[in-house]
Amino acid sequence: MFGFFKKDKAVEVEVPTQVPAHIGIIMDGNGRWAKKRMQPRVFGHKAGMEALQAVTKAANKLGVKVITVYAFSTENWTRPDQEVKFIMNLPVEFYDNYVPELHANNVKIQMIGETDRLPKQTFEALTKAEELTKNNTGLILNFALNYGGRAEITQALKLISQDVLDAKINPGDITEELIDNYLFTQHLPKDLRDPDLIIRTSGELRLSNFLPWQGAYSELYFTDTLWPDFDEAALQEAILAYNRRHRRFGGV
């Protein structure tokens, strides 16, 4: 399942032979990273944005097709107002300082979540990024903003119920495939909607309402590395761990 590259006859270096097509990332640990440096939490969020740029470029180079990043959850509104305001301004800075390079590297930017609740400047920055990169054919960087997995499924069920009432579909038409077409990830190619691998940084061992439908059969990788310290080498290690596993999808 994985190969070896001989670096100098004496040393064998394991390299991945299978790259996950879709990687989900729960970018956790920005606040703790800042605290360790006696800096405010927002300092960590800024460093986390720089890490995202580096990891996206590395993933694109490795041949990953989609990265979905958990940028802001529906529960994160309970954080201090100043921190929320800072986070909501990061997409503006991201568009100004990072999107041009990603665009030059053929990266396509998209967003999922209840985006109608986002502040105007946040929504406009991401919409501009989507418009600028819409014809790119490389890696898709999928921002989950104001996203919650349960809310996503609830909204899908409401839409399906309305379509049943409007006689657009029959109850017997409701299948897993149909539900999949009502989720936020419906804009992705069908074979790329479900993450092959979900990474969570910072040592926390939970998924926190991230892609519960799409991640049903995802391989999970937890690392103690705080998100701002997660780099290309850390990404490669996660992919190596993925390579060592046998995905059964309920079989043997």
Which role does the model predict for each range below?
Residues 1-252:
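Flexible, compositionally biased loop and terminal segments
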